Amino acid sequence: LDHNTQPGGSVSYSGQTGGLNYVLSAVAEPRYDHNVSKETSILADFALNDEVREERIREQTSYDFSLNLDYELSLKSSVRFNALYSENDNPTDVLRYTTDLRATPRATAIEREEIPGDRNNWEIGGDYEYLSEGGDRFKVLFISNRNNSASTRERYDVFADGSESKDLFLDLGSVTTERIVRGSYTMGLFEGQDIEFGAERAQTTLDSSLALGLPSSAGTPSADFGGLVPQAVSNANSTVEEIRIEPFIIHNWIINSRMTLESTLLYELSEISQSGDVNRTRDFDFVNPKVDFRYNLTPQLQLRGSAEKVVRQLRFSDFVASNDPQDNDSITLYGNENLRQEWFWKYDFYADYRLPNDIGVVNMNLFYHQHKDRIARIDVSPSEDNLQSANGNIGDGDVVG
């Protein structure tokens, strides 16, 4: 839009020393964005309400540095290690013009926003694999990562004489960490059959904070809130942690040259705790089976049927107060500490037909899903004058298609 040009590039170096293979890389990717938008709203009787014109400029360049190591310990064992560090600061400036279409003459209010943003993350991971003489395989892996995000949104009313008055201070910060370790052992059973069993343990933590300041005659302005009056926000400062353990067993069976069957049984045990403005601990457990059958009816026609229980992982950001920068009508979004995992039974039938001379493939999918504890937006308004919504469990439902 403004013909802005920014440089970017990447460089990598790879090599081998004995049994060690390595790759180092660095990437600088410009993500500058200049966006101009117009939004017109109407009332319930279809009368024009207002028009909002907004110019948003984001100055951002992503810097990524990675390392990959692969070492062959012997003909039967190997180890790998990966590391990543990334910086994605995204300072943003906003200029907004709001025209009241109900007023005569029409009046336009001007707002300016400064939103410095700091974002960075890192991740390390690795795995070890051992193959026995008989073809059995043992594998263990680990992953550890951390994501840091912080932003301070300050909004100003701009008057006709060029003077300004701050009317919003919103400081947001979050740190998400995750640690996963998984081990498995795969062995043959009978001809055409093998079994894999193991377990996974994961720890996920979110530290979240939100500070809101508004101009108000009721209260004392604070420098920590941009010179505005601190406002009470429900669930603004919280730490959410989940400890999850998943033992599993997977059986693969090649019945014949045309049919295969995969069966999985997973047991999920988790504890979710929240501390800070809200203190609560809950335990959950699920048994998740899965069956997947494949049949090559002809070389051109493949059929597949599956049935499984799926448990969706919760988004920790739904537990705590947050902000939608694209919604100017709602400064903060409520969190919901009572969320439960959404889960569903998933039944699918697939058919793939390969057209003659390999000119294409025709696919068909029939499905039936039984959802439990579906998550969607619910009303959590404390009063008719303070309308609020949050993600919550709305009940059960079926999906057919």
Give the residues covered by each predicted segment:
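Outer membrane beta-barrel strand-and-loop segments of large Gram-negative receptors
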Residues: 178-182, 336, 340, 346, ...
